[in-house]
């Protein structure tokens, strides 16, 4: 069958589509078109499978719309822009922010772009995402950032989601020079949080996880000064020994496990900040009577939707890097195998990258 083209683009494309709990399929979909003058169409060069995609598949994100194309973490090349897009043009290499924001509403004007009245987590949740050959990006001037010439697609790939999330988690933890910072979870966000904590001045970073491979990955890339194999080693005792019995000056919870929220506040010293960037599939309990007297500050939130330009600059300068997270690659045609392997954490899979596109 002869492939049809309009404006030098195919009419249809392959895409990973969410059809309901436990039901994700690779199927044929129309190539997206401009719907609003603030839109851009991007050819996807690299995309990933994220833990948030697994949460959608597992039914833990009720606002996700059945029938949408999954995916929100990608880089690519702009192929078309709407008439009101002024910062972008066809041919630009761009990194995408996983959050959609308008830049003009009540919250955006105050810098709280994650709470945009016209956006939020839209791509791959409420509207079609990037696990496809092309994607439409609303408010493109806000949601797409040009990639510096010296930065590769794969170096920039995680800027708009897991690096932004990890950096946000570290930044809201109020880390002071020389602090002991405990990071729970050596998954992609946790590893990014650890690297960000180092950049922000942490003196000792302790990473806690049940996966020995991921802990070794943290050590190899100098993200951790101390690692704790949870369930085998005692995280609370380790942190106390490092801090003269006080506890961590800041804790970043990036695991989202059944017992990791409790571990987070137990690791923290009195008057510490506990930063929660994990996404939980079950409700958590805040046992105030047990915590009374610790005077803890809890801060929560996901990706910082305004940080992409800053993070790309830090990547360009060599201050932060994330390319070591890529353990598996495949074309889009094999994405269902990616969901299986990434979801089961088989073969030491940290990030599965979809490599459709001609350049790195």
Give the location of each predicted region:
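Short N-terminal strand-loop motif that marks the start
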Residues: 1-75, 133-135, 139, 230, ...
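C-terminal hydrophobic helical "lid"/dimerization subdomain
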Residues: 2-13, 233, 262-266, 305-360
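Glycine-rich beta-strand-centered segment in the early N-terminal region that forms part
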Residues: 32-47, 60-109, 148-151
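Mid-domain Rossmann-like dinucleotide-binding core that forms the NAD(H)/NADP(H) cofactor-binding site
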Residues: 89, 149-232
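NAD(P)H dinucleotide-binding glycine-rich loop of Rossmann-like/cofactor-binding domains
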Residues: 102-184
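Glycine-rich cofactor phosphate-binding loops and adjacent beta1-alpha1 units
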Residues: 173-175, 200, 215-297, 336, ...
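Conserved acidic E/D residue at the C-terminus of a beta-strand in Rossmann-like folds
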Residues: 209, 278, 302
């Amino acid at each position: 069958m002869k492939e049809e083209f309009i404006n030098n683009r195919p009419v249809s494309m392959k895409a990973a589509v969410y059809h309901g709990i436990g039901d994700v399929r690779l199927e044929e979909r129309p190539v997206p078109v401009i719907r609003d003058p603030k839109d851009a169409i991007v050819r996807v060069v690299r995309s990933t499978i994220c833990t948030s995609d697994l949460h959608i598949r597992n039914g833990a994100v009720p606002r996700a719309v059945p029938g949408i194309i999954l995916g929100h973490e990608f880089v690519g090349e702009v192929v078309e822009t709407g008439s009101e897009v002024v910062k972008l043009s066809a041919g630009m290499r761009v990194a995408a922010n996983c959050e959609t924001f308008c830049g003009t509403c009540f919250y955006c004007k105050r810098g709280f772009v994650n709470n945009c009245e016209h956006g939020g987590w839209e791509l791959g949740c409420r509207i079609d995402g990037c696990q496809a050959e092309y994607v439409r990006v609303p408010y493109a001037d806000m949601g797409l950032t040009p990639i510096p010439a010296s930065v590769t697609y794969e170096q920039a790939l995680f800027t708009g989601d897991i690096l932004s999330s990890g950096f946000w988690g570290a930044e809201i933890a109020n880390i002071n020079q020389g602090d002991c910072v405990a990071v729970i979870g050596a998954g992609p966000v946790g590893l990014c949080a650890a690297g960000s904590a180092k950049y922000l001045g942490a003196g000792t970073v302790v990473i806690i996880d049940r996966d020995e491979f991921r802990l070794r990955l943290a050590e190899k890339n100098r993200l951790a000064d101390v690692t704790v194999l949870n369930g085998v080693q005692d995280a609370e005792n380790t942190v106390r020994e490092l801090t003269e019995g006080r506890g961590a000056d800041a804790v970043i919870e990036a695991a989202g496990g059944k017992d990791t929220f409790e571990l987070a506040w137990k690791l923290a010293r009195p008057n510490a900040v506990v930063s929660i960037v994990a996404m939980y599939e079950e409700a958590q309990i805040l046992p105030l009577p047990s915590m009374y007297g610790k005077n803890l500050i809890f801060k929560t939130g996901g990706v910082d939707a305004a940080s992409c330009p800053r993070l790309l600059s830090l990547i360009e300068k060599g201050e932060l890097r994330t390319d070591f997270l890529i353990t598996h690659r495949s074309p889009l045609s094999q994405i269902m195998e990616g969901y299986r392997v990434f979801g089961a954490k088989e073969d030491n899979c940290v990030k599965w990258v979809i490599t459709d596109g001609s350049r790195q």
